[in-house]
Amino acid sequence: MPVRWYNYVSMKVSLNLIKQLINFELPPVDELVSRVNQQLGGVEEVIDLKAKYGGARIVRVVECEKHPNADRLSVTKIDDGGVADVPRDDNGYVQVVCGAPNVHADMWAIWLPPKSTVPASFDDAEPFVLDARPLRGILSQGMLAAADELAIGADHEGIIEINEHDIPAGVTLQTGASFAEVFGLDDYVLEIENKMFTHRPD
């Protein structure tokens, strides 16, 4: 008789993905969790990705100059489409100091404005909430984010540069757009204990 091994004890389920596969409306998350607990297995965690990435915005870097007091820093001006409540210059642009070697004018990037939480720290006991602060004498309104800071990769060598081919089909790059909405991260993920699989008699 063959022996079957079930190495996984839980699975993660995206509600956005489920919505693409069904032709009816899902109940509110709390109600859905209750039903899953009753019929499938225990929901171990509900991950609110929209809250995790809620502050992240897609922006265009319109100016980039060397920091006058630091060789490895740049002073940028970004266009966020006017969505954030932050100080601006006469052209409506926001000043952000950046230490990434790949930052340059005319690039599209991901901005975490003041009062937003760095996604990589979202689940920490004390999440890192950004504020406007001076870096070597120049005020920076938040930060331009690298992959590891967004918890979507390990790269910290440079900030994420968004190109046209990175954008989902049918979506146009717009300044100030929600990073979560553009890339399908306005989602809940349920981590479910796989009782229905791991407790099978075979």
Task: Outline where the language-model segments fall.
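Phosphate-backbone binding interfaces of nucleic-acid-interacting proteins
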Residues: Y6-D202
